[in-house]
Amino acid sequence: KRTLLCCSRWQGLLLLDLNTGKCRRPPFDCGKEIMNVLIDSQKRIWVAPYNGGLNCLTHDGKLLATYTTHNSSLSNNVVLSLAEREGEIWIGTDGGGINILDPETGHFSLLEHVPGSDNYSLPANSILCLYNDYNNNIWAGSIRNGLISIREVSMKTYTDLPATTAD
């Protein structure tokens, strides 16, 4: 069945039937203000409700875990972006940097901006977009400080736009 799970900042989760183009609600409710959603390699559904941390659900919507600043080491409850890399969930937050969650242990690691440190420091702590490419590099789009390439041994920030010429 060709169905796409989508999220909307104001309409919550939606299932889009790619054959008919019709949307319907999933059989479970996660609220209306959903910032991001990810289905990982284990078919778990990760849902980021606005200012609600991160929820992990089974494919049929049963709640497996909830991570917030109150019950875990998540650095910020406003989760803007999600990606998976080698079984870990990368979590871009609005002001809390990038949290890396091992779903098996519940342990968080943190990548953040450290003032005065260029090595292994993010240029900013608000991460709008995360993407894991085919070479297993994470690309992070910050809100005001450029595009960040995160590799196993290095990090590079791109802030300058290439010059454009009029045709």
Where are these regions (language model features)?
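Carboxylate-rich, polar loop motifs that coordinate divalent cations or form catalytic acidic clusters
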Residues: 1-167
